[in-house]
Structures are given as C-alpha cells and as structure tokens.
C-alpha cells in the first residue's frame, strides 16, 4: 500500500476577470519554479574510485628515441598488409557484433534524450466536442427535449520541479550509460580489428606450412623413385622402400591436417567480414599452388612498447566503460533517494469554452494554474529497499572496475612477455632452419653417394621440415603478440625507430 499526500492550489476564473494580477501571479509562480528547480543535493558528487595501478610495466624498457602513436584508431595500417586493411574495412561495414554494439550506443543516446526531456516543461493540447440530448420528465413540462452542443480547446502546461535532483541525476546516469556504450563500441571495434589481423596472420602461416609439407612430399617422392631404381639394381632393400613410404604417408597426413586448419581460418575470416571464401583467399594471397612456390607474405610487426600504466588505464575502452558504469550507479543512488521524497509539479491550463443550448450560445475562457505536492506516506519499505539495491549495484560496479583494471594490467604484461618470447623464438628458429637446411643438403648428397643410410637422410629431412614449420609459427606468434599488445593497451603504444621494416 502506498498513500500519498496531494495538495493542489489552483486559481480559476473567466477571461473577463483576468486582470494584471493574474499575470503577476504567473510570473511569481514561474520564478518560484525556477528557484525550486535548482534542486538539493542528496549525496556528494561522484569521484572516480581509487585504482590500484602499477607505476611501470615489469617488462618496460627505456623510453628514449620513440615515436608516439598512442590511440591510433587505424593501428592495423602499421603492419603494411593490404589484406588486413581490406578485410578490416569489410568487417567494420558488415559485422553483426559491431552493429549490435553501435545500436546499443544509439539506444543509450535515445534514452538520454528521453531523460533530458523531463527537465523541460511539457505542453499538450486538450480539445473535445460534445453533443447531448436531454428530456424533461417532470410533470410540468413532461416530454420536452433539449439538444446542446459544447466544445473546448486549449493548451495544458506541466512541469515537475527537480527539487531533490531526481531528474538531473537520471540525466547524469543516462549520460554515463551513453559514455559506457560508446566505450563498449570502441572496444568491440578494437577486438574485431585484432581478430581479423590475427586470423590473416594465422591463415598465412597455415598456408606457408602447407607449402612446406608440399615441398617435403615432393622431395620424398623423388627419393622414393630413386630408392626403387636402386631396389631394382640391388643397391637398396625393401626395408628402405618401406621406410620412405612410411615417411611419405606421415607427411601426407600432416598436409591433410594443415589443409583442414587453413580452411578453418578462411571460414573464420568469412564469418568476421561477411566476404566470400574466394574473396578472402584472393586478398590473403592463398592459392592452391603446388610445391616449389614461394611462401606468402608475412608482415613483420613494428617494435612497440605500451604507454605508462596511468595512460593506458585512463584511455582503455574497457576501463572507461567500467568507470562510466560506476558513475551511473552512483547517480542511481541519488535517484532512489529522491524517489522517497516529495515531488512538486507545476500545472497550468488555458481553455476556450463554447456552449449552445435552447437556441442560445455562450462562450468564455477559463484558466488554471497551481502547484501540486505528492509524497509517500507508507510504502512498506520499498523506497529504502530501492536505495539499498542501488548502493549494491554501485558496489558491484566499482568491483567490476577494479577487476577490469587488473585484467587489463594482466593482458598488457602477458603481451609484453609474449613479445619477448616470440622475438627470441624467431631468432632461434631462423638459425635452426639455416642449420637444418645445410644438414639436409649435405645428407642428401651423401646418401646419393652411398655414404650414409636412408634412415639418416630421412631424419635430416624431418628435422628440416620441422625447423621450417617452427619458424613459420614463431613469425606468426611475433605478429600476434604485437596485436595482443595493441589490444591490451587499447592502442596506447609507442614505436621504436625501426617501424618501417617489414617483409
């Protein structure tokens, strides 16, 4: 049960009685309304909760000789990869997840418009027309029928005075929600670009690995032909042929697995961009070429370091969204408190009246103006419960903010560690490929000369293919570590001077 007190002070009169005192009263009433609408604060202004941020990243190096590109909205251009540029543009134009995020921004903007409209007076038009028929049933003039027509029209004015800040705090909360949804859209855009870039790198690495296995199979088939010639002349045994066939079958199995992985990467890009698989393959440079074809282009990511933690955490879209949600939750507490207090509404109306009955007509104007006061007397504790609920939501929002800061910090640290690891693996795997290639070349010549066994040749061939595959994976991981750093920092990075070097 919820009882309310209603006080209605209104003044009404006919047009002929409306003198200058009426207009003075109206001006005084509006002046009081403007004064009262200033509101009374029910709680302190919102202050961003203190955030536990590191003073520096654990893997941070010196900041000298760096080119700042923090917050670059088109950071993927730094990879100098036309396929990533084209597919990212396509994804931005037709990705359902991004479209949903942008629609939530528009929804929040519309909600802000609704909340903001409550701060302004509302003006409506009231009009009605009535035709009535009455019959006299008294003994004196029994059976006399009278028709009457009446009409009225005029504007009606209403305005809730924001005495305790309920409306203004609702507007603040709606504005904070809009800022949060805008940050969410930026985060979605950042993640989408990162996903496209990651998948392009993965597809190119997969294609390069596929070509490694094609070359390996072609080499094994040549060895098989030579072994069979030797077998016919008695220089080789059936065991040698079986060993070659075993290795060839293993390589063909690896190739089939690689082809499946490449198809999955193409499908992932199709889902992200809405482009056909043929368009994706054409952009990335993936073909069905056979052995002996050069590997596809793999971009080399520029050397990058994150900005200082305070800069990253202040601009990262996920952190911004969480902080704005906390601000909105704080404003909601004030709204819940204001809902427990009286409300003052100012209403005014002006109406023209016209009546015609019994052959005569009458027209006149009426007006009314006055405030009304409503307030809860008994609500069973619902108001207090709403305040506690709003306070709990604020506590949850601040906890989510702290969790987001910690997660962002962890992501940056992990990306930095992965950068260091990937760079070391690129160097070591490159050295491994050179050594394995030399070993295989020498072993192949020695086997043809009969100096070593087929087992030794196959072992060196297997090591060479594995070394090539490891280098491809390391280069892919290096690019993806850079992308992970960009995503983790919200593109708040700086570049070292060798930014233009790429393959």
Which role does the model predict for each range below?
Residues 1-21:
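N-terminal secretory signal peptides that target proteins for export/translocation
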Residues 2-5, 24-93, 175, 259-314, ...:
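Terminal intrinsically disordered/low-complexity segments used for targeting and assembly
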Residues 48, 249-278, 336, 422, ...:
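Short segments within alpha-helical structural elements
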Residues 94, 101, 160, 167, ...:
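Amphipathic alpha-helical coiled-coil segments and their boundaries
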Residues 167, 176, 182-308, 418, ...:
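Periplasmic alpha-helical coiled-coil/stalk elements that build and connect Gram-negative outer-membrane
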């Amino acid at each position: 049960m919820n009882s309310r007190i209603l006080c209605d002070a209104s003044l009404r009169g006919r047009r002929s009685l409306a003198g200058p005192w009426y207009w003075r009263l109206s001006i005084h009433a509006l002046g009081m309304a403007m004064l009262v609408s200033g509101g009374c604060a029910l709680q302190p202004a919102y202050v961003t909760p203190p955030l536990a941020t590191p003073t520096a990243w654990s893997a941070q190096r010196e900041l000298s000789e760096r080119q700042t590109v923090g917050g670059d909205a088109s950071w993927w251009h730094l990879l100098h990869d036309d396929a990533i540029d084209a597919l990212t543009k396509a994804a931005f134009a037709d990705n359902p997840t991004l479209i949903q995020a942008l629609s939530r921004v528009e929804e929040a903007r519309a909600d802000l418009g609704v909340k903001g409209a409550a701060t302004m007076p509302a003006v409506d038009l009231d009009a009605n027309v009535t035709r009535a028929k009455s019959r006299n049933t008294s003994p004196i003039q029994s059976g006399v029928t009278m028709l009457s027509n009446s009409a009225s029209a005029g504007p009606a004015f209403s305005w809730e005075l924001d005495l305790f800040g309920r409306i203004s705090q609702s507007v603040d909360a709606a504005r904070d929600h809009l800022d949060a949804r805008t940050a969410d859209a930026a985060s979605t855009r950042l993640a989408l670009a990162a996903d496209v870039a990651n998948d392009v790198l993965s597809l190119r690495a997969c294609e390069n690995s596929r070509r490694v296995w094609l070359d390996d199979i072609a080499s094994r088939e040549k060895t098989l032909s030579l072994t069979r010639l030797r077998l016919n002349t008695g220089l080789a045994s059936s065991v040698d042929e079986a060993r070659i066939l075993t290795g060839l079958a293993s390589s063909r199995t690896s190739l089939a697995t690689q082809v499946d992985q490449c198809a999955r990467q193409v499908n992932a890009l199709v889902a992200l961009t809405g482009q056909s698989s043929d368009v994706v393959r054409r952009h990335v440079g993936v073909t069905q070429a056979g052995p002996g074809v050069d590997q596809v282009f793999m971009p080399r990511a520029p050397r990058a370091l994150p900005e200082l933690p305070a800069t990253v955490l202040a601009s990262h879209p996920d952190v911004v969204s969480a902080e704005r949600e906390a601000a909105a939750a704080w404003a909601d507490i004030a709204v819940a408190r204001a809902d427990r207090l009286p409300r003052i509404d100012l209403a005014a109306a002006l109406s023209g009246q016209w009546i015609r009955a019994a052959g005569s007509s009458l027209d006149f104007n009426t007006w009314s103006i006055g405030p009304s006061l409503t307030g809860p007397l008994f609500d069973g504790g619902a108001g207090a419960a709403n305040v506690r609920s709003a306070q709990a939501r604020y506590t949850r929002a601040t906890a989510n903010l702290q969790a987001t800061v910690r997660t962002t910090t962890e992501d940056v640290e992990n990306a930095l560690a992965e950068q260091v690891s990937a760079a070391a693996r690129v160097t070591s795997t490159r050295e491994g490929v050179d050594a394995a290639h030399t070993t295989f070349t020498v072993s192949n010549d020695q086997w043809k000369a009969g100096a070593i066994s087929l087992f030794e040749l196959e072992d060196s061939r297997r090591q060479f293919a594995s070394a090539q595959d490891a280098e491809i994976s390391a280069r892919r991981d290096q690019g993806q570590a850079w992308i992970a750093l960009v995503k983790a920092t919200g593109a708040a990075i700086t570049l070292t001077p060798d930014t233009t070097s790429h393959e």
